[in-house]
């Protein structure tokens, strides 16, 4: 088994090249299972310490991550490829009516382009320029392949401990590894999930995940964490029905980033103001989300999404006051709120009708069983 896995990781296996070619279409959405570790790993506020096993222990959002080989954290690249695999896994196993298929494949070029990597050679005006452009594209492909292999290797050497309520029961997970094997070629990315990860994921609810998240620069980790948090909040049905899917308090968003908290601002010896250390980087991250096409708009607002006036915005002169503001935002490419509400209501009615049908069928079977018993 170990030998087979080794060959698979090194790209020597003869597995199929078939993949999910339409998974990363621009301006589209993907469906993905969503659970505690999958969302927590997008949070960049991690604390690195050493334990007795010489592994790196990272604590974030009540989960503990153990990374071998001295890795101090999991970056944006690791979370992107993991969630790409989860989306492909959801597409393949989302019906939950059969034993999950652990192996998923998707198109390398489509994924690279979704991540903003220019892997296709442009048409140039001269043979010399074309040769240089072809070489540039080939180099970009090789570098991205190398990066993906490093991302997948980090995930393979990462185990996670956490507790989570699944199907109304509290469950404890220890030492779970999500990715057990991988293969990267110039055509296909193939990931193999561990059996324990697959069994866990098929119990989870599904969410809508914008493809635009992959276009965020890997180095802009605050923007990525914020983007994941805003899009997850925007996709929740209960938020849509309450009319709050596009509103979040700045203070809560900051908790998902490495930007300084109020306590860190007080303790710091930096001479930079709260505006330069927190507000400006926060707004730069939001602008990055507009640049990559995730957000169509954002602004500070009052409780019902009413924008702050210029006078109100300029009057804010402290970190405390700024962090209590609401951020109003719109995630691009989602259906309008009214349409989303109608779909949610229709799904509720369908679920209700199915439950009533099941209940009636159960009663009917009991009556027939009772009748047969009486005749006997």
Where are these regions (language model features)?
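Charged, alpha-helix-forming regions
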Residues: 1-376
């Amino acid at each position: 088994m170990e030998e087979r896995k080794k060959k698979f990781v090194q790209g020597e296996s003869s597995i199929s090249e078939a993949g999910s070619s339409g998974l990363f279409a621009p301006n589209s959405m993907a469906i993905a299972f969503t659970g505690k570790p999958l969302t927590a790993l997008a949070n960049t506020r991690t604390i690195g310490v050493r334990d007795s096993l010489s592994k790196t222990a990272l604590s974030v959002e009540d989960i503990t991550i153990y990374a071998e080989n001295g890795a101090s954290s999991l970056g944006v690249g690791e979370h992107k490829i993991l969630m790409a695999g989860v989306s492909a896994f959801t597409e393949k196993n989302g019906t939950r009516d059969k034993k999950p298929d652990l192996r998923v494949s998707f198109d390398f070029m489509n994924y690279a382009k979704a991540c903003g990597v220019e892997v296709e050679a442009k048409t140039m005006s001269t043979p010399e320029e074309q040769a240089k452009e072809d070489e540039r594209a080939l180099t970009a492909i090789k570098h991205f392949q190398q990066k993906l292999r490093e991302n997948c290797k980090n995930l393979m050497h990462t185990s996670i401990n956490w507790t989570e309520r699944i199907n109304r029961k509290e469950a404890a997970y220890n030492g779970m590894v999500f990715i057990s094997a991988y293969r990267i070629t110039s055509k296909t990315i193939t990931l193999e999930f561990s059996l324990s990860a697959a069994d866990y994921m098929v119990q989870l609810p599904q969410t809508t995940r914008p493809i635009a998240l992959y276009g965020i620069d890997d180095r802009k980790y605050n923007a990525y964490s914020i983007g994941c948090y805003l899009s997850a909040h925007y996709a929740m049905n209960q938020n849509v029905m309450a009319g709050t899917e596009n509103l979040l308090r700045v203070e809560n968003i900051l908790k998902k980033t490495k930007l300084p908290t109020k306590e860190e601002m007080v303790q710091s010896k930096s001479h930079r103001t709260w505006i330069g250390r927190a507000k400006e980087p926060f707004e730069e991250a939001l602008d990055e989300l507009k640049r990559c096409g995730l957000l169509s708009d954002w602004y500070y607002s009052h409780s019902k999404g009413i924008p702050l006036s210029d006078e109100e915005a300029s009057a804010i002169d402290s970190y405390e006051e700024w962090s209590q503001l609401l951020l109003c935002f719109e995630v691009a490419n989602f259906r309008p709120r009214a349409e989303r509400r109608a779909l949610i209501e229709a799904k509720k009615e369908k679920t209700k009708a199915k439950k009533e049908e099941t209940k009636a069928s159960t009663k009917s079977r009991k009556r027939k069983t009772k009748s047969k018993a009486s005749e006997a």
